[in-house]
């Protein structure tokens, strides 16, 4: 006898989803101690955290691929929240890194376009969190550039312009925003948050998670624990506990 026939299947369990969309800082976020891994751990049995980070990508490319990642479907397929975290590559200096560089005005327009696309597939602004690029430690990043045989291709002051543009898009569109560029420089030497001047160190991952979680928590606080706690499973007939709606 098939397993489903023997026990009765119950309704399919559909996990809510949190989608992280961004560049390498998102792609690497599932490494040990990463901010994405911390989110997944915090939300286990409540929500799947999907990593859709693409190392080296800018908003021009992100805008093109977003419709391939999220399409209009039934309400159960709609992510409970989406983070959009770009700017580290867009803000590269045009003369030194023309492939990744995106003009400031286009960067803002691309962010706005992505927020508008999400709205068109029934993900409203209140489910979207924009994240500004992190500050750049120029001395550390220049060392990496020299190793790769190139000149310093980013400046923190320029990154700040892109961070401000991200803040303005969030204000215009009505989304939440996490201003990492400002927060990381607020009280101490921010270089400790960065492993190579650009990407996050363990301390930087912890910093991002601690500031992002309150924004995420507002959007997932009503999610129940999926399936009962083990002590609450009916001993004689576990099917009574395990084939219901799982809201325990």
Swiss-Prot record:
Keyword terms: Hydrolase, Lipid degradation, Lipid metabolism
GO BP field: gene expression; lipid catabolic process
A Pfam match: Lipase_GDSL
Site residues by UniProt (Transition state stabilizer): 56, 89
Record flagged with keyword tRNA processing: no
EC number of this enzyme: 3.1.-.-
Superkingdom of origin organism: Eukaryota
Gene Ontology MF terms: hydrolase activity, acting on ester bonds; identical protein binding
Active site: 24 (nucleophile), 196 (proton donor), 199 (proton acceptor)
Residues carrying N6-succinyllysine: 63
Family indicated by similarity: Belongs to the 'GDSL' lipolytic enzyme family. IAH1 subfamily.
Protein purpose: Probable lipase.
Protein name as catalogued: Isoamyl acetate-hydrolyzing esterase 1 homolog
Organism of this sequence: Homo sapiens (Human)
Gene designation: IAH1
């Amino acid at each position: 006898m098939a397993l489903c026939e023997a026990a009765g299947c119950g309704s399919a369990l559909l996990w809510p989803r949190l989608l992280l969309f961004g560049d390498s800082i998102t792609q690497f976020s599932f490494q040990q101690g990463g901010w994405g891994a911390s989110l997944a751990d915090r939300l286990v049995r409540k929500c799947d955290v999907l990593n859709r980070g693409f190392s080296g990508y800018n908003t021009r490319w992100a805008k093109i691929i977003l419709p391939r990642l999220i399409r209009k479907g039934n309400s159960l397929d709609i992510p409970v929240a989406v983070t959009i975290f770009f700017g580290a590559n867009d803000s590269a200096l045009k003369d030194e890194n023309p492939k990744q560089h995106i003009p400031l005005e286009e960067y803002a327009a691309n962010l706005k376009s992505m927020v508008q696309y999400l709205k068109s597939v029934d993900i409203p602004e209140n489910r979207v969190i924009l994240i500004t690029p992190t500050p750049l430690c120029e001395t550390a990043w220049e060392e990496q550039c020299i190793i790769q045989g190139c000149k310093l291709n980013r400046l923190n002051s320029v990154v700040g312009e892109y961070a401000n543009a991200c803040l303005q898009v969030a204000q215009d569109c009505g989304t939440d925003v996490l201003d990492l560029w400002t927060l990381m420089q607020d009280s101490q030497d921010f270089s400790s948050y960065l492993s190579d001047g650009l990407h996050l160190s363990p301390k930087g991952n912890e910093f991002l998670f601690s500031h992002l979680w309150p924004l995420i928590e507002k959007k997932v606080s009503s999610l129940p624990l999926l399936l009962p706690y083990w002590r609450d499973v009916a001993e004689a007939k576990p099917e009574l506990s395990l084939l219901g709606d799982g809201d325990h």
